[in-house]
């Protein structure tokens, strides 16, 4: 975990249904510090005595700063109902928000975002409500690139990764040999992150004999699981992906509640 800061500079060359009511402390805003500056986070705390397994959620590139997101909030709430301390890190806290059409800025900011995530994981290490040995990443698009990068750099801190339509930056492929278990979820008609990146990750993890699963959704585009993006949303694929995600988390975080 401590090694994230040391190698994040390498990333400068690296080319994102739920219950109606919840039995936990709901979407709570907080912050931690990274490099002496604040980073906004939101968390949902499950009922019962901890320490709990935890899931760190990372948004995609389209997230706006300080805007919240009801769909991420729903996911956070459902995961808390399943017994996970769930934290949503707003990693744009120290940079401007960027979009898919800004690759140069994205490349420059990537190490900053990764350092923020590093600091967030450090804060979870010290949180008495969290079991630091059972922490997973749940990433979407750009958030998946960050999740996989964190897993490649320091797999000992991360027990599992669920990645929706992302990939592993080529500069970090060396980390595949010790990557934690990964669930790959991708649409074969993705116009933003080509499905070839999912297949490349699958081949790399297979070569390194790392545990992983992959599901490619036929006809699905990018962000197929977000109702707010109606043009790409597919309810059946979204539900299937969420079911696979929660089963994968339960299996790899040894969550006895589900």
Residue ranges and their predicted role:
Residues 24-50:
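N-terminal cap/lid segment of alpha/beta-hydrolase-fold proteins
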Residues 51-60:
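Short beta-strand element of the alpha/beta-hydrolase
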Residues 62-71, 78, 88-112, 226-228:
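Cap/lid segment of the alpha/beta-hydrolase catalytic domain
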Residues 106-127:
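Alpha/beta-hydrolase active-site loop
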Residues 129-139:
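Alpha/beta-hydrolase fold nucleophile elbow
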Residues 144-155:
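Short glycine-enriched nucleophile-adjacent loop
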Residues 184-186, 190:
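Short beta-strand/loop motif that positions the catalytic acidic residue
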Residues 208-258:
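C-terminal catalytic histidine-bearing segment of alpha/beta-hydrolase fold enzymes
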């Amino acid at each position: 975990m401590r090694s994230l800061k040391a190698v994040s500079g390498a990333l400068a060359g690296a080319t994102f249904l739920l219950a109606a009511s919840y039995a936990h402390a709901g979407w709570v805003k907080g912050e931690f510090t990274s490099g002496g500056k604040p980073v906004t986070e939101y968390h949902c705390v499950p009922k019962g005595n901890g320490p709990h397994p935890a899931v760190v959620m990372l948004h995609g590139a389209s997230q706006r700063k300080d805007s919240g997101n009801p769909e991420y909030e729903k996911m956070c709430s459902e995961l808390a109902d399943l017994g996970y301390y769930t934290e949503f890190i707003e990693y744009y806290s120290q940079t401007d928000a960027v979009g898919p059409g800004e690759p140069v800025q994205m490349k420059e900011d990537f190490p900053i975002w990764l350092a923020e995530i590093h600091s967030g994981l450090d804060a979870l290490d010290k949180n008495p409500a969290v079991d630091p040995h059972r922490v997973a990443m749940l990433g979407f698009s750009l958030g998946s690139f960050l999740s996989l990068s964190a897993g490649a750099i320091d797999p000992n801190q991360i027990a599992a990764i669920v990645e929706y339509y992302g990939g592993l930056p080529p500069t970090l492929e060396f980390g595949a040999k010790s990557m934690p278990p990964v669930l790959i979820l991708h649409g074969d008609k993705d116009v933003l992150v080509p499905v070839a990146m999912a297949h490349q990750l699958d081949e790399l993890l297979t070569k390194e004999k790392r545990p992983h699963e992959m599901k490619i959704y036929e006809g699905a585009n990018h962000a197929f699981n977000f109702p707010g993006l109606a043009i790409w949303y597919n309810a059946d694929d979204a539900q299937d992906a969420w079911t696979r995600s929660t089963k994968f988390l339960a299996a790899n975080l040894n969550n006895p509640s589900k």
